[in-house]
Amino acid sequence: QGVISAVNRGPRRRLDSVVVQSQPSGAEDVHFEPLSDEQQAALGSDDLEHRLQRSGLWGAFRTRPFSRVPLSGSRPHAIFVTATDTRPLAADPAVIVGADPGAFRSGLRLLPLLTSGTVYVCTGPGWNNEMPEVERLTEVRFSGPHPAGLPGTHMHFLDPVGTGRVAWQIDCQDVMAIGKLFSRGEVPSSRVIALGGECLSRPRLLETVMGASIDELLADEFRQCGGCRTLSGSVLDGRRASDGLAYLGRYHAQVSVIPEGGDRRLFGWLLGKGMRSWSTSQNGRYSGMIPLPVFEKVMPLDILPAALFRALLVKDTDQAQALGCLELDEEDLALCAYLCPAKTEYGQALRSSLEQIERDG
């Protein structure tokens, strides 16, 4: 609850953000009736959906394909809970869930009500939180470098999506929020995020509110390192947080602050595979697509990335679907875009094709 204090618009009157000043301390919060374990076990899928929509937590789910909030009354063939994160500078979900494992388990017990298929809990190395014994709930552990922690990678290997096969994804912190909603009657508005980047004096985990002002979060946090760029999200798939977009994204769990860069380092390739500095330097120039074998090296999915990128750039949606674009989101192509010497934004091309496919049916 709060008061709208600003409406920020971009080019062509595009709505960038609506700024809501939160209610003063001590004002009445929104509460729901807490349910016992027996009452939760007796819930139906429609009852669960109704409370999630009333609380605003229905928007925590996203569909694959297309990455949309599910339509009311729709049901997926599988649900994927993301409890691992391999993005640069990201927090360890095991630590976040370990702060309140009961809420996480309570939320997991409810998710099978929304699907007739399997609920996959995708974890990473070091996960030691106990899982509830629930029918159609399966823990799968992933390891390896990025993008091993992305939902698209998990779906590809466990239960691929496509035309007529829709899966939902949800973050582990949102599962904890669902657990608190039903077992305690609370509507959590907080989220644990990672503040990271060499421009910050104190990189750390921080509990804040969803949609928080990033300018306020980073007050007095900068080192004296020249120009910096602030991102909501990771350095690979986040967005620039400035002006009307200087707020924490709904699905972002980190804020990254990196040097603006722009300087070329003489013989920088001699540094080998040691520690490197994340900056905004492109180390390349805009040109036509260059089909390099490095795409296959960083793409764990069983697809042909160069052929797919070519189809996306020329807007050949039929060929793009045949090559697996319906399984993907922008974050799945972010690493390829980072490595591309032509500086091609494959994520934007993917989103354009997905929107066209969605419109055409």
Task: Please give the residue ranges for each predicted region.
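Buried, small/hydrophobic-residue-enriched core segments of structured protein domains
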Residues: 10-361
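Generic structural motif
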Residues: 1-6
